[in-house]
């Protein structure tokens, strides 16, 4: 059972650092989270155990978790894992930034026919996927259709769904009245799939018209309208789509359109992407993405066979499987869902590519590479001038002081993840100043005194970074930090065997043996003079132990 921790003043649960609240539901909040190792954003639904019990919705929550764990579809919100604490459940799900389709329609009104068709095709593909996996959603509505940054639809909230069995009829009346089928509000028996078709028809109408086909503030009157099945069709609607709507909103479920009928309709087939209805129904489980597997191996410093075993084990809580699905989904999102999840290999470039990353917040250029502050000309500001050893040094630059550090051409996120892993292994304690600046201490087992140092990652040039080690004297006033208390090494819990950020790929930048000698370079940092005697030796021993651990 996981425990809540503090990270830079924010709550950390498992691998995820929680951020702002995205919304508040009946059972708790939904917050944005960030996977500490991969950097991917997720949505974390927080379910309070006591509230779940008091509202008697344990079964509803269990169904939602059970269903989402099974699903891997580009237009269904994915559940990556569930983390339990004594007080709460944390459902870690796919994050989308576009909000609800309901809010989009309220703000923009009816959608252009071509765009409405594109969204409806995505929604129906997701519903078809549910039905093929014997799951009926039963509460489809624009509020449960989310939009990502590229205006792709994602179905969410499977709490009301039932898994279908042959010959089984559902008697439960649930869902929102405006979108509910006549047989649902009448309490009649229904098989399941046909109620989702009705709801899809209401959603399509809302997309095309900007209003609902059945609406009334007086609920009995609303029910009468739904049972009568009479709704207004605007003149501007294409005749072809009007016939489709009438077929989907048939009161008699036996006469209502099926998914097969909709897929064969001429209006629906226009510009239909092939990935939405793949011919091979086994696409969602049997094809493993080799590039994603390799990326997991690099990040967690594990073998491909370990990743494959995790994927085939079927354990959704396995950290390697969770990281694999995060990588896959985010690559697909960046590709605007143009290829189906697991149907083929996504592009090899990472969404965290250096060219798109520029300088992350909190990461500073190394002072050695910063321009002198005596002129305002572009030439004086150019970092390349600082690299030119043939040029006379500006008088404004102080005499350089030696420092100890490690250079790397890995991504800054990977470097810091490796540092956290090493500190955890060494049982160091630390306080986060920002994402790339830590204050670290270690207790001398003999004297009982604490040795302190500062670790800061600097941008040396557009290709490499420098992890700087600096001694901290006890007399120095601590900088203000986002964390109120120093973090124990457990704050990096779950960073299981990340890839070494200092693997040898170039002679100067990645060799640790070369780093110790090559990184004794000039720095304009105003370092604190360490205390004489044992403190200096303790500091260097602390540096040596960290460097040795990073080299493993």
Curated annotation (Swiss-Prot):
Coiled coil: none annotated. Ubiquitinated. It holds the Pfam family AdenylateSensor. Its main location: cytoplasm. It catalyses: L-seryl-[protein] + ATP = O-phospho-L-seryl-[protein] + ADP + H(+); L-threonyl-[protein] + ATP = O-phospho-L-threonyl-[protein] + ADP + H(+); L-seryl-[acetyl-CoA carboxylase] + ATP = O-phospho-L-seryl-[acetyl-CoA carboxylase] + ADP + H(+); L-seryl-[3-hydroxy-3-methylglutaryl-coenzyme A reductase] + ATP = O-phospho-L-seryl-[3-hydroxy-3-methylglutaryl-coenzyme A reductase] + ADP + H(+). Activated by phosphorylation on Thr-172. Binding of AMP to non-catalytic gamma subunit (PRKAG1, PRKAG2 or PRKAG3) results in allosteric activation, inducing phosphorylation on Thr-172. AMP-binding to gamma subunit also sustains activity by preventing dephosphorylation of Thr-172. ADP also stimulates Thr-172 phosphorylation, without stimulating already phosphorylated AMPK. ATP promotes dephosphorylation of Thr-172, rendering the enzyme inactive. Under physiological conditions AMPK mainly exists in its inactive form in complex with ATP, which is much more abundant than AMP. Residues 480-490, 501-510 have a biased composition (Polar residues). Keywords: ATP-binding, Autophagy, Biological rhythms, Cholesterol biosynthesis, Cholesterol metabolism, Chromatin regulator, Cytoplasm, Fatty acid biosynthesis, Fatty acid metabolism, Kinase, Lipid biosynthesis, Lipid metabolism, Magnesium, Metal-binding, Nucleotide-binding, Nucleus, Phosphoprotein, Serine/threonine-protein kinase, Steroid biosynthesis, Steroid metabolism, Sterol biosynthesis, Sterol metabolism, Transcription, Transcription regulation, Transferase, Ubl conjugation, Wnt signaling pathway. One of its GO terms (biological process) is fatty acid biosynthetic process. The modification Phosphoserine is found at residues 377, 491. Its cofactor is Mg(2+). Its EC number is 2.7.11.1, 2.7.11.31. Residues 511-521 have a biased composition (Low complexity). SUPFAM superfamilies: KA1-like, Protein kinase-like (PK-like). GO terms for cellular component: cytoplasm; nucleus. Residues 477-521 are annotated as: Disordered. Catalytic subunit of AMP-activated protein kinase (AMPK), an energy sensor protein kinase that plays a key role in regulating cellular energy metabolism. In response to reduction of intracellular ATP levels, AMPK activates energy-producing pathways and inhibits energy-consuming processes: inhibits protein, carbohydrate and lipid biosynthesis, as well as cell growth and proliferation. AMPK acts via direct phosphorylation of metabolic enzymes, and by longer-term effects via phosphorylation of transcription regulators. PANTHER family: 5'-AMP-ACTIVATED PROTEIN KINASE CATALYTIC SUBUNIT ALPHA-2 (PTHR24346:SF104), MAP/MICROTUBULE AFFINITY-REGULATING KINASE (PTHR24346). The AIS (autoinhibitory sequence) region shows some sequence similarity with the ubiquitin-associated domains and represses kinase activity. Belongs to the protein kinase superfamily. CAMK Ser/Thr protein kinase family. SNF1 subfamily. AMPK is a heterotrimer of an alpha catalytic subunit (PRKAA1 or PRKAA2), a beta (PRKAB1 or PRKAB2) and a gamma non-catalytic subunits (PRKAG1, PRKAG2 or PRKAG3). Interacts with FNIP1 and FNIP2. Interacts with DUSP29. Interacts with ARF6. The phosphorylated form at Thr-172 mediated by CamKK2 interacts with ACSS2. This is 5'-AMP-activated protein kinase catalytic subunit alpha-2. The gene is PRKAA2.
């Amino acid at each position: 059972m996981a425990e809540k921790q503090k990270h830079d003043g924010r709550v950390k649960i498992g691998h995820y650092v929680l951020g702002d609240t995205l919304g508040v539901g009946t059972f708790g909040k939904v917050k944005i989270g960030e996977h500490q190792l991969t950097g991917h954003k997720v949505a974390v639904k927080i379910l309070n155990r006591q509230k779940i019990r008091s509202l008697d919705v344990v079964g509803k929550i269990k169904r939602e978790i059970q269903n989402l764990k099974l699903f891997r579809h580009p237009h269904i919100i994915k559940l990556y894992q569930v983390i339990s604490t004594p007080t709460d459940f944390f459902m870690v799900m796919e994050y989308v930034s576009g909000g609800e389709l309901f809010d989009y329609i309220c703000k923009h009104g009816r959608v252009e026919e071509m765009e409405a068709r594109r969204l409806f095709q995505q929604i129906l593909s997701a519903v078809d996927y549910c039905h093929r996996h014997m799951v009926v959603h039963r509460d489809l509505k624009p509020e449960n259709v989310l939009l990502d940054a590229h205006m792709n639809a994602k179905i969410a909230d499977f709490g009301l769904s039932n898994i279908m069995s042959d010959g089984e009829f559902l008697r439960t009346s649930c869902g929102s009245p405006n979108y509910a089928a006549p047989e649902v509000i009448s309490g009649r028996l229904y098989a399941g799939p046909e109620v989702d078709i009705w709801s899809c028809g209401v959603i399509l109408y809302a997309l095309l018209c900007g209003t609902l086909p059945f609406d009334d503030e007086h609920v009995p009157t609303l029910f009468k309208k739904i049972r009568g099945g009479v709704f207004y069709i605007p003149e501007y609607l294409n005749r072809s789509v009007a016939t489709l709507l009438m077929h989907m909103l048939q009161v008699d479920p036996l006469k209502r359109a099926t998914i097969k009928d909709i897929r064969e309709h001429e209006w629906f087939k226009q510009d239909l992407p092939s990935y939405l209805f793949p011919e091979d129904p086994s696409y969602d489980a049997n094809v493993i993405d080799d590039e994603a597997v390799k990326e997991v191996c690099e990040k967690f410093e594990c073998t491909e066979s370990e990743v494959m075993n995790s994927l085939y084990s079927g354990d959704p809580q396995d950290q390697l499987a969770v990281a694999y699905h995060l990588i896959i989904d985010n690559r697909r999102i960046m590709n605007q869902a143009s290829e189906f999840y697991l149907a083929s290999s996504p592009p090899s470039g990472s969404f965290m590519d250096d060219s798109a990353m520029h300088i992350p917040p909190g990461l500073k250029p190394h002072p050695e590479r910063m321009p002198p502050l005596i002129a305002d000309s572009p030439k004086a500001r150019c970092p390349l001038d600082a690299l030119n050893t043939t040029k006379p040094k500006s008088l404004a630059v102080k005499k350089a002081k030696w420092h100890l550090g490690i250079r790397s051409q890995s991504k800054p996120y990977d470097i810091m993840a490796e540092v956290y892993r090493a500190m955890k292994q060494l049982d160091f304690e630390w306080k986060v100043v920002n994402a790339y600046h830590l204050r670290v201490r270690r207790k001398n087992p003999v004297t009982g005194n604490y040795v302190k140092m500062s670790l800061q990652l600097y941008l040396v040039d557009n290709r490499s970074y420098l992890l700087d080690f600096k001694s901290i004297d006890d007399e120095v006033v601590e900088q203000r930090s986002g964390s109120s208390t120093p973090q124990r090494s457990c704050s990096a819990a779950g960073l299981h065997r990340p890839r070494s950020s200092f693997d040898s790929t170039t002679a100067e930048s990645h060799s640790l043996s070369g780093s110790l000698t090559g990184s004794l370079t000039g720095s304009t940092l105003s370092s604190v003079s360490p205390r004489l005697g044992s403190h200096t030796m303790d500091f260097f021993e602390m540096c040596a132990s960290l460097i040795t651990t990073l080299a493993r």
